[in-house]
């Protein structure tokens, strides 16, 4: 929903003079040039869910996505303002009930597209008026941020499924989902490379801001390239995946532990680069600049939930998904 309401969708949420929310068309939405399908994934993100659980959330004291901070449904305390305390319905919050690897998420997305394009053939780009056959569905996949990693993996899986369909490994009745374009927006492509780039940018950029000194830069890059550092562990992780978990099912504990260690090491490798008092997305600006999140309040209105047929409130961030991925990266 971030992409739909804050970035490229056909409309955006605005606050009216009376404090209510409504939508208005986005002038440069991507729907000007294409049909767009936004997918909430992995399970328990956005409007996707496994089970429906009724809970109460205090947004002041709790981390709402955390399973440990959920409370049984209860009345709002008298000293707590209405905006801060909400009763709602959410996914289970269980890490065992979501995809814990990008390869598994790729499979889930392929099966979703199979179901969606079959159930709604008029949205299938492979359906042509006056024809009885369905041509290959030529789609354009765009992914952002971590999409720099999952986008290529999704693309590879779609093509592998097409090959399996051709050689008879899977039924011919499966739709051929042909990838026309893979687009990556502000993508995270490679952790060691990103860590080095962040440190270099923090030390030397065209805006004249410098928030790491030469010693921090040199120590950071040396640590990244050292034995047992970010780069070394990332390479060990890749080698272990290739030999012990080539299908990406996440069922080799030694590989999971090694890759989790690599992730943690790389996350902290360039940490000095992110200790900056300005916006990480636009270092000219203080504080953080970006589209507002009013769409969350809009989507969580009872009338909107009823209109779109969602049994759960929207969840912009899922602790269950993050914990599952961190445990088996």
Task: Describe each PLM feature range.
Residues 29-32, 132-135, 174-178:
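Extracellular/periplasmic catalytic domains that process cell-envelope and extracellular macromolecules
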Residues 147, 168-181:
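C-terminal or late-domain output modules
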Residues 40, 143, 147, 151:
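Gly/Ala-rich beta-loop-alpha elbow adjacent to hydrolase catalytic centers
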Residues 110-117, 155-159:
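Amphipathic alpha-helical interaction motifs in eukaryotic regulatory proteins
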Residues 1-19, 28, 37-107, 111, ...:
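Accessory cap/linker subdomain of secreted extracellular hydrolases
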Residues 148-163, 182:
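Short glycine-enriched nucleophile-adjacent loop
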Residues 24:
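Caspase-like (clan CD) cysteine peptidase catalytic core
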Residues 119-130, 159-174:
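Extracellular/lumenal inter-transmembrane loop segments of multi-pass membrane transporters
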């Amino acid at each position: 929903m971030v992409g739909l309401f804050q970035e490229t969708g056909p409309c955006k949420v605005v606050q009216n003079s009376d404090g209510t929310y409504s939508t208005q068309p986005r002038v440069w939405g991507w729907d000007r040039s294409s049909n767009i399908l936004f997918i909430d994934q992995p399970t328990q993100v956005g409007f996707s869910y496994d089970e429906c659980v009724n809970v109460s959330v205090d947004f002041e004291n709790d981390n709402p996505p955390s399973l440990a901070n959920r409370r049984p449904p209860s009345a709002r305390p008298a000293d707590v303002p209405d905006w801060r305390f909400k009763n709602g319905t959410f996914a289970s919050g269980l890490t065992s009930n979501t995809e814990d690897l990008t390869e598994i998420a790729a499979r889930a997305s392929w099966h979703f597209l199979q179901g969606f394009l079959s159930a709604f053939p008029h949205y299938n780009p492979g359906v042509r008026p006056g024809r009885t056959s369905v041509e290959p569905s030529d789609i354009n996949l765009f992914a952002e941020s971590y999409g720099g990693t999952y986008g290529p993996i999704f693309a590879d899986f779609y093509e592998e499924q097409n090959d399996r369909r051709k050689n008879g490994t899977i039924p011919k009745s499966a739709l051929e989902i042909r990838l026309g374009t893979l687009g990556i927006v502000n993508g995270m492509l490679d952790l060691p490379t990103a860590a080095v780039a962040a440190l270099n940018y923090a030390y030397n950029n065209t805006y004249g801001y410098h928030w790491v000194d030469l010693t921090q830069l040199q120590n950071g890059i040396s640590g990244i390239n050292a034995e047992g550092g970010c780069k070394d562990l990332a390479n060990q992780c890749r080698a272990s995946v290739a030999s012990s978990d080539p299908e990406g099912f996440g069922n080799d504990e030694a590989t999971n532990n090694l890759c989790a260690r690599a992730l943690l090491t790389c996350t902290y490798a360039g940490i000095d680069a992110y200790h900056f008092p300005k916006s990480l997305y636009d270092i000219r600006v203080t504080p953080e600049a970006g589209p507002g999140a009013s769409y969350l309040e809009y989507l969580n209105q009872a009338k909107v939930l009823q209109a779109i047929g969602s049994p759960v409130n929207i969840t912009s961030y899922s602790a269950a998904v993050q914990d599952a991925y961190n445990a088996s990266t």
